[in-house]
Amino acid sequence: MPSRAAILPDAAYRNLKTATAMKSFHKELWMDVPERMGFVNITRDVEAALAESGIREGLCLVNAMHITASVFINDDEPGLHSDYKRWLEELAPHAPLSRYRHNLTGEDNGDAHHKRQIMGREVVVAVTGGQLHFGTWEQIFYGEFDGRRRKRILVKIIGE
């Protein structure tokens, strides 16, 4: 059986041989939201991490490292954030605590786990020319659903 390189066109093989090694960079951001539920625009923090990484082309993963928090992309418009809070509370109300079997363990955050599930765990954004490659109005947000304690966000950037 021929080697993989043998079945590539000459130009593709030359590009493989001259490719640079991919860089990997990570940074942790810390959040301390004083309310039970809140949204924080972290776009500038992620942009600062990207600048620090020196990576010009690649991918940027931003991940909430707690099971009652989320990272998502949307518009930074206060009415939308208010709508999200109302909608999430309608879908997974905090009270009554007895609504959630999870709370039988002594916890009081069963709703926060559901809210996180709805809003998602992480986002991945393309990096182009050393910038986050967003669509119009897109911003990165941290969503907190069981606040009042310090939590961590992972920013992982890979590329060249």
Model-derived features: positions:
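Active-site histidine-anchored catalytic micro-motif
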Residues: P2-E160
